[in-house]
Amino acid sequence: MVEEHRDVIYVTSNYVPGYRAVEVLGFVYGLTVRSRRLGGQIDRFKSILGGEIKEYVTMMEHSRQEALERMLDHARELGANAVISVRFDSDSISDIMQEILAYGTAVIVEPEE
């Protein structure tokens, strides 16, 4: 599936269907770090019982979107109009912080003829 954010196309595949890459500009990424403290004891209690922590899910969705937007801004700075091989990664920095990374390869694409 091809997505477009303002003027930059992004895909998880190694190419954009219907386009050809005419220049590879390099690695781009967007990073955000968020605190996981969301009510302390209530969240611990929910996790013991196995329930979903909706506040945490919402925070992670917003973090993922922010990392994606930062990656696309990085691509724009390089002059790209597309990012291929887009991936996300997540890691805990400590007991209270979560890191979200969006990354891919910035390219210039043109429609195939």
Swiss-Prot record:
It holds the Pfam family YbjQ_1. SUPFAM superfamilies: YbjQ-like (SSF117782). This is UPF0145 protein MTH_544. Belongs to the UPF0145 family. It comes from Methanothermobacter thermautotrophicus (strain ATCC 29096 / DSM 1053 / JCM 10044 / NBRC 100330 / Delta H). HAMAP family: UPF0145. It comes from the Archaea. PANTHER family: UPF0145 PROTEIN SCO3412 (PTHR34068:SF2), UPF0145 PROTEIN YBJQ (PTHR34068).
